[in-house]
Design a protein with these regions (language model features):
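Donor nucleotide-sugar binding/catalytic pocket of nucleotide-sugar-dependent glycosyltransferases
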Residues: 144-196
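Nucleotide-activated donor-binding/catalytic signature segment of Leloir-type glycosyltransferases, i.e.
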Residues: 245-265
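A conserved mid-protein helix/loop that constitutes part of the nucleotide-sugar donor-binding site
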Residues: 32-33, 205, 209-228, 241-245
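Short alpha-helical donor nucleotide-sugar binding micro-motif in glycosyltransferases
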Residues: 156, 261-262, 269-274
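A charged, aromatic-enriched C-terminal amphipathic alpha-helix characteristic of glycosyltransferases
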Residues: 339-373
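Aromatic "clamp/platform" in nucleotide-sugar-dependent glycosyltransferases that forms part
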Residues: 102, 282
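Short hydrophobic beta-strand element within catalytic cores of glycosyltransferases
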Residues: 299-302
Length: 387
């Protein structure tokens, strides 16, 4: 496959109506972005695909009863209205249900799907039990771990298959009792794939971090690198519980700017404006933003804590750092690369990313085909008894 011949429609059409039910709003976090991108990626290959999830409209959350997420006021916990959810499932008449988030939203959806005899695929993206230690201590951390462990185990018991996007996450799913745990890849926003690719940068001068401003992302390593590399310019794009702290730090660093939340429509432009993307995370089940930068022919530096480094076909297009404390040192080394070295690495990164996207599409279509009800009109009618 050559880069110029890459096609977004190489996989055949299959019979199926796929319904994704998630409490992650589209593009508000990694999981929300994953399934919005997956819908676009599969829409030409299945009969129908739709997502039921909360939405942020005019800065107001809609789609259920919303509670603030402890430790992060930019995210919400959503409690679904079971009767509304039941009606939406009935109206769509799915042949397979995909549930990517634990908690009450996912559990209610799984129970409704199970009662109707619909096959369920669980997307296991985040090990919240590990994140709990970064946000809370003592009793609150213990309660959070217990809740998510219970929730994940309950979802796994109700599902036919569990998919995770790294070997580590597959192993964790196995330990928690998930049936048929398997590996999935990562789709990308179609704009990243079809927008004309700008030339590979001739040198490394402009550095980008893009993601949630949260403890697990280790954003302070980017601030420290900006202080240590005055000849480079740094941009931090995103929102999260650490935004105020990051903005305070950036106010005294001349070569660092903080953009805040960036609309999804600007992602291609933002990546193309920079030479290198950095992701120094302490916990990262995959790291989709790294794949996004790879497909735009940009240099990508990631920590070895990112799940993307477990993919041999992708590490050929990455530069992996074992310690975020040496981020500035590694950036300085990359700034000394020749134009040829940079071109070779960045074009290889794009080729790796394109192959991965195509492989992931085939995998998802295979899973949908495997668990598909052959006759959508035969789907049972969902009923919920009022008590």
């Amino acid at each position: 496959m050559t880069l110029s011949s890459f096609s977004l429609a190489e996989q055949p059409q299959i019979s199926g109506r796929v319904l994704i039910i998630s409490d992650a709003a589209p593009h508000r976090n990694g999981v929300g972005a994953y399934y919005a991108d997956l819908m676009d990626d599969l829409s030409d290959h299945v009969d129908a695909i739709q997502m039921i999830s909360p939405e942020l409209i005019d800065e107001k959350w809609q789609g259920g009863w919303m509670l603030p997420l402890p430790g992060d006021n930019t995210q919400k916990l959503c409690l679904p209205n079971a009767f509304e959810l039941q009606q939406k499932i009935r109206d769509f008449r799915p042949t397979v249900i995909v549930i990517p988030t634990p908690g009450l939203f996912g559990l209610v959806a799984a129970l409704l799907a199970k009662r109707a005899g619909l096959p369920i695929i669980i997307g296991f993206h985040t090990w919240f039990e590990k994140l709990a230690g970064l946000y809370w201590n003592g009793v609150q951390s213990g309660l959070t771990r217990t809740f998510f462990e219970f929730s994940n185990k309950a979802l796994f018991r109700l599902a036919q298959k569990t998919l995770a996007n790294s070997h580590e996450m597959v192993a964790i799913a196995d330990q928690l009792g998930a049936p048929n745990a398997a590996l999935m890849g990562t789709p990308l926003d179609q704009r990243l794939l079809i927008s004309p690719v700008v030339p590979v940068p001739k040198s490394v001068r402009r550095v980008l971090f893009m993601g949630r401003l949260a403890a697990e992302k280790n954003v302070m390593a980017v601030v420290e690198a900006a202080n240590a590399c005055p000849d480079l310019t740094f941009t931090i794009a995103g929102d999260g519980p650490l935004r105020e702290d990051i903005e305070t730090q950036a106010s005294v660093v001349d070569n660092l700017r903080v953009l805040g939340w960036v609309d999804r429509s600007r992602i291609v432009e933002l990546i193309d404006e920079h030479d290198v993307l950095v992701l120094p995370s302490q916990v990262e089940s995959f790291g989709t933003v790294a794949l996004e930068a790879m497909v735009r022919q940009r240099l990508v530096l990631v920590s070895d804590a990112c799940g993307i480094v477990e993919w041999p076909d992708l590490t050929r297009g990455l530069k992996v750092i074992s310690d975020s404390k040496i981020l500035a040192t590694e950036l300085s080394r990359c700034a000394d690369w020749s134009e040829f070295e940079l071109y070779s690495h960045c074009t290889r990164a794009r080729a790796c990313a394109l192959r991965h996207v195509q492989w992931n599409r085939r995998q998802w279509l295979d899973h949908i085909r495997e668990y598909n009800l052959l006759d959508p009109d035969a789907c049972p009618v969902l009923t919920v008894q009022a008590r």
